């Protein structure tokens, strides 16, 4: 976790306008949107770190915090994998290619990829929780030789909920071993059944003290993932989660996203587990 | 610069000087049976001869036996209504042929002189400065207003039953953060300048150096405020106390009394939570993004697509109190409470946070 | 044939004030008429286009067997049914009959009570049919009505705040009349929507937008009792336009029982 990349100057409420350059349907109710800045200077300046998010703004409808799913080295188009859930994402889903919207960002903390160098890395993703981890996968693949054993454990409610399946073969070939599992099986499913935590329990860990685990998914899944990892001997300081809260400003000024002493928008969304653990599973905090 | 003396009859000259410098004067005035902050034109608008009597859940305006200008403490308003307005436009968006044109609103042209800012309120402004100006991101709305304001502080010479600034080390003496600070005596004010702008204004007023007797009278007047404070919040170890007692039975106890009505957060001079909404015409071609005061006591405040995080009064009261007194320290290096007592007075059912903290210090049954 | 959504306005037991709010939306009415086909709105025009309708705005409570049948027909004819106003969402002021003997009222008011067919209660639409959205208030707020219509035209969920009235008093700078004057005020437990009008005009909120979510009415009532206000003053305050909502009813019933016990 590092300090925000964005400068302290300027008006944090101002949006850039971006145009939808491409829409790729993923799973039911989920699509990946590639955005291009209408202002080339803004495009040249824009950089993000894996785990960070943007505020996407549809005038008259509102803003939504959406994590980046793009390649960290992207320079022209930035993809966001978005599930239709609220008013903003519903309205976004009605826009086609060429549609224009507002964007502020990037905001928040990022996955500690540099701390993963020389280590084994496990990614545990539940459902659409894989979206903010995809930039990590891209980065690990791009610098494969710098890391040890790389594993992605991806769980979903049903086979139709597994994300980016068309890329899994490439990831496997590139050296990230992908394992998938589903809560509820289906007629054509021959794979694992159970939660991603079950996959983690079975995963051989040759050197737990030198393994980093990054997880994103429902709170309860991340909780049990962290518990399983601790039981397997991973230090709490090498577990990282990505939290979610109501966000309105994204810059620590509106108060909505607090989780104990943390502002999820600024201190998170990516937290080292030992920092957030005292507050993470307190009911209603 | 030595303490100076301003005759009461010359207070209007200070107001005229500030008006002449382009400041709009805002200060205490009687309205709706309370002392509120509003625009004032002259010393005649001040609540001269009035005082307030406060208790948990109760505020009464009463006449004084003397003609004091500042013989009361703090009311339902705070200066945040000028620095962090209850409603502000963040951005406008207009539909164009190719998409949207988005603009920041123009910066305000007015500048305010705050008249009668108390020590706890100076502390509150400092707390909000830390939030809005000194973090990674600066709030442009707050900054534009804060940069331009002139502060005339007033030392309290009495205390309400709800005051506890001495527990929070924020008062009652105004130490810093003002341009001018006044201490009211029977016929004059002792004036201290706290900034270059303050010293400049002093140079344009008919002031003379205060005599030792006058300085002693001011000291005695200020001491009355200290002596009048009866409420106490024990702050020793308060951060750990609250954050390690998140399941204390007292939270359910206070939740049975708390209305979750948000009054405490609205009157609090440091609470800074807000929500952003869209205001559009029916066609949706012109849009304004508006920020409004909001509160962690509202159900929707923590709503996500998956549901509401703090879905009962217990969790919301706990959020407010732990944030104000404990996690604020983690976030901003200081307490979010300045001991002004507004949340106690203006709670419709008389909940007193100092009593809640005291109860949290007791182990549950 | 128009492809604009078809809007119908229906009335049950009510004063017509909420429907009039639609006519009162003068600045927006032309835009509304442009965006919707107003197929049935007897308060404005005798033209009635038969159903089905895309949106029905329904005012009034259910007080007669005929009402109870007719609201089911309205539901059958309407894709999206919006209950507007305290009568439609809570039974209205006429729900005071729910605490009394309606036959007694009939005998007192009508020369031939046997001509009158009525139910013993006045109840909200949602007690009879599925309601898609409830717009509270007595009367409803014009701005909120326009928001509901704009949202339906845009195909999104209406944005109507559900916090308490106190937030709005504080935002507009109104001094709390409960704390500063000891006036019993329902603001802390009442849903906003009016813009906090009454306290700004020196009177307590009388709850016309109904209970706020998770309203702690019992604690507020206890505080008043401790402060010297008697149940005789509090029961009528709670039994008002939204008196028959469960939150207000439970506490007024408790206070009434206390009053009866002391008499």
Task: State where each predicted segment sits.
Chain B
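Iron-sulfur-associated redox domains of electron-transfer enzymes in respiratory
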Residues: 1-243, 249-251, 271, 282
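Single, functionally critical "micro-switch" positions that shape active/binding sites
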Residues: 21, 261, 340
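Extended amphipathic alpha-helical segments enriched in small hydrophobics
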Residues: 255-265
């Amino acid at each position: 976790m590092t300090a925000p990349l964005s400068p302290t100057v300027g008006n944090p409420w101002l949006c850039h306008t971006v145009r939808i350059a491409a829409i790729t349907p993923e799973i039911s109710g989920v699509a990946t949107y590639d955005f291009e800045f209408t202002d080339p200077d803004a495009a040249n300046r824009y950089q993000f770190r894996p785990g960070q998010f943007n505020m996407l703004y549809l005038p008259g409808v509102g803003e939504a915090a959406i994590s980046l799913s793009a390649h960290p080295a992207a320079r022209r188009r930035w993809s966001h994998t978005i599930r239709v859930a609220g008013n903003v994402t519903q309205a976004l889903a009605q826009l086609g290619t060429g549609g224009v919207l507002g964007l502020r960002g990037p905001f928040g903390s990022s996955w500690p990829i540099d701390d993963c160098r020389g280590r084994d890395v496990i990614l545990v993703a539940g459902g659409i929780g894989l979206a903010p981890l995809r930039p990590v996968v891209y980065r690990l693949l791009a610098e494969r030789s710098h890391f040890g054993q790389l594993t992605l454990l991806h769980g979903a409610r049903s086979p139709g909920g597994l994300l980016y399946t068309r890329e899994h073969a490439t990831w496997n070939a590139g050296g990230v071993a992908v394992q998938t599992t589903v809560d509820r099986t289906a007629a054509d499913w021959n794979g694992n059944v159970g939660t991603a935590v079950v996959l983690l329990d079975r995963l051989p860990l040759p050197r737990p003290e030198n393994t980093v685990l990054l997880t994103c998914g429902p709170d309860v899944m991340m909780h049990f993932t962290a518990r399983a990892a601790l039981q397997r001997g991973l230090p709490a300081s090498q577990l990282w989660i990505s939290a979610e809260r109501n966000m309105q400003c994204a810059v620590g000024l509106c108060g909505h996203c607090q989780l104990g002493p943390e502002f999820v928008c600024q201190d998170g969304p990516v937290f080292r587990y030992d920092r957030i653990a005292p507050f993470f599973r307190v009911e209603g905090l | 610069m030595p303490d100076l003396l301003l005759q009461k009859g010359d207070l209007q000259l200070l107001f005229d000087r500030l008006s002449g410098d382009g400041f709009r004067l805002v200060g205490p005035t009687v309205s709706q049976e309370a002392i509120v902050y509003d625009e004032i034109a002259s010393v005649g608008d001040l609540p001269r001869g009035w005082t307030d009597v406060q208790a948990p859940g109760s505020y009464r305006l009463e006449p004084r036996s003397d003609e004091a200008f500042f013989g009361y403490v703090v009311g339902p308003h705070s200066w945040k209504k000028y620095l962090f307005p209850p409603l502000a436009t963040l951005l406008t968006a207009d539909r164009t042929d190719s998409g949207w044109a988005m603009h920041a609103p123009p910066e305000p042209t007015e500048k305010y002189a705050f008249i009668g800012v108390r020590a706890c309120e100076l502390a509150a402004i400092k707390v909000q400065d830390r939030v809005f100006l000194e973090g990674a991101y600066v709030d442009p709305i707050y900054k534009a207003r804060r940069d331009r304001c002139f502060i005339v502080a007033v030392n309290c010479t009495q205390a309400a039953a709800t005051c506890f600034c001495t527990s929070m080390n924020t008062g009652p003496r105004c130490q810093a953060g003002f341009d001018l600070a006044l201490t009211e005596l029977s016929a004059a004010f002792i004036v201290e300048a706290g900034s270059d702008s303050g010293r400049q204004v002093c140079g344009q007023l008919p002031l003379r150096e205060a005599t030792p007797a006058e300085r002693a009278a001011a000291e005695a007047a200020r001491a009355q405020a200290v002596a009048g404070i009866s409420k106490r919040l024990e702050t020793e170890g308060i951060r750990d106390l609250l954050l390690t007692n998140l399941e204390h039975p007292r939270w359910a106890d206070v939740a049975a009394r708390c209305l979750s009505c948000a009054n405490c957060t609205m009157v609090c001079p440091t609470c800074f939570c807000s929500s952003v909404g869209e205001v559009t015409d029916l066609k949706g071609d012109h849009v304004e993004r508006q920020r409004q005061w909001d509160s962690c006591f509202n159900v929707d405040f923590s709503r996500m697509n998956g549901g509401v995080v703090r879905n009962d009064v217990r969790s919301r009261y706990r959020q407010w109190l732990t944030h104000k007194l404990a996690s604020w320290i983690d976030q901003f290096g200081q307490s979010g409470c300045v001991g002004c007592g507004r949340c106690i007075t203006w709670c419709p059912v008389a909940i007193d946070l100092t009593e809640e903290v005291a109860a949290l210090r007791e182990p549950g049954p | 044939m128009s492809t604009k959504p078809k809007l119908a306005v229906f009335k049950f037991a009510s004063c017509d004030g909420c429907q009039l709010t639609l006519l009162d939306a003068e600045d927006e009415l032309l835009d509304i008429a442009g965006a919707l086909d107003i197929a049935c709105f007897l308060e404005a025009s005798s033209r009635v286009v038969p159903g089905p309708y895309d949106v029905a705005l329904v005012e009034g409570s259910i007080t007669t067997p005929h009402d109870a049948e007719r609201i089911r027909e309205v539901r059958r004819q309407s894709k999206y049914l919006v209950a507007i106003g305290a009568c439609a969402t809570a039974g209205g002021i006429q729900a005071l009959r729910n605490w009394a003997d309606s036959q007694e009222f009939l005998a007192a008011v009508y020369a031939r009570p046997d001509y009158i067919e009525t139910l013993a209660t006045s109840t909200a639409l949602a007690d009879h049919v599925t309601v898609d959205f409830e717009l509270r208030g007595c009367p409803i707020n014009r701005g909120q009505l326009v928001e509901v219509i704009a949202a339906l035209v845009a195909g999104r969920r209406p944005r109507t705040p559900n916090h308490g009235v106190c937030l709005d008093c504080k935002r507009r700078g109104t001094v709390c009349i409960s704390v500063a004057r000891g006036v019993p005020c329902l603001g802390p437990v009442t849903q906003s929507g009016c813009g906090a009008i009454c306290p700004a005009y020196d009177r307590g909120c009388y709850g016309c937008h109904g209970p706020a979510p998770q309203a702690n009415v019992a604690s507020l009532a206890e505080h008043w009792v401790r402060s010297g206000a008697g149940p005789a003053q509090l029961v009528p305050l709670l039994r008002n336009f939204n008196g028959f909502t469960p939150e207000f009813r439970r506490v007024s019933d408790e206070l009434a029982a206390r009053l009866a016990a002391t008499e």
